[in-house]
């Protein structure tokens, strides 16, 4: 067989195989619901936008989503559809590092979500959501090398109880109290050696009463934030 005929046969094989492969994707069932493997491309390109499998209109298994960047695309997210209606989601950077991961139901984040520092395997933020998609539970933020930087408690989307800030050496440097998502109660600031440098009280997000500033264990400044009306109503 001549070289020209071999080339022709090879091209025909590629065309037939390509058509056959394309025929496996993007099918509908008798009710016009997407069914079987699907693969969609960015308009006018051969760059895949997403791929996954449908079962009579419902996503099943793992879907892959790609982000276009000029003439290339890269894996930007995976979604694993579970039988209980939850979706396990992972977002990726261009460098194939995990950006964040957690579960969703519909548009709502639920359960524990973890976010990572840029181009790193170190956790940046860990937080928990309730079934309505609002923050609920302990939220923690970390320094790039893994030390805890901040911790606060949420109850159905609102900060409650104690919020703590930490220096990289683990020392508490700020301590606040929250009630119904407002600063309410005693507040204290410390340096990274644990020495108190500020103390005062909040009432519904506003400073109130006597605030004190410290240096080397001694008070160096005081200021009274007690509210005093400028005008008294006539009797």
Language model segments and positions:
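Glycine/tyrosine- and acidic-biased, solvent-exposed loop/turn segments at the edges of beta-strands
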Residues: 19-235
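Bacterial Sec-dependent N-terminal signal peptides
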Residues: 1-25
């Amino acid at each position: 067989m001549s070289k020209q005929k071999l080339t022709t046969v090879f091209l025909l094989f590629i065309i037939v195989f390509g058509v056959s492969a394309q025929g496996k994707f993007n099918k509908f069932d008798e009710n016009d619901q997407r069914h079987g493997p699907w693969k969609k491309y960015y308009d006018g390109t051969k760059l895949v936008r997403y791929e996954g499998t449908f079962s009579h209109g419902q996503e099943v298994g793992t879907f892959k989503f790609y982000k276009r960047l000029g003439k290339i695309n890269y894996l930007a997210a995976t979604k694993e559809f579970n039988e209980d209606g939850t979706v396990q989601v992972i977002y990726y950077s261009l460098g194939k590092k995990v950006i964040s991961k957690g579960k969703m139901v519909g548009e709502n984040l639920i359960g524990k979500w973890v976010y990572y520092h840029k181009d790193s395997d170190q956790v940046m933020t860990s937080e928990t959501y309730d079934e309505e998609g609002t923050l609920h539970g302990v939220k923690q933020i970390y320094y790039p090398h893994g030390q805890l930087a901040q911790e606060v408690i949420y109850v159905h989307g609102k900060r409650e109880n104690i919020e703590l800030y930490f220096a990289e050496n683990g020392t508490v440097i700020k301590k606040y109290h929250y009630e119904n998502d407002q600063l309410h109660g005693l507040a204290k600031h410390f340096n990274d050696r644990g020495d108190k440098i500020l103390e005062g009280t909040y009432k519904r997000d506003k400073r109130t009463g006597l605030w004190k500033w410290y240096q080397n264990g001694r008070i160096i400044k005081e200021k009274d934030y007690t509210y005093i009306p400028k005008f008294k109503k006539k009797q």
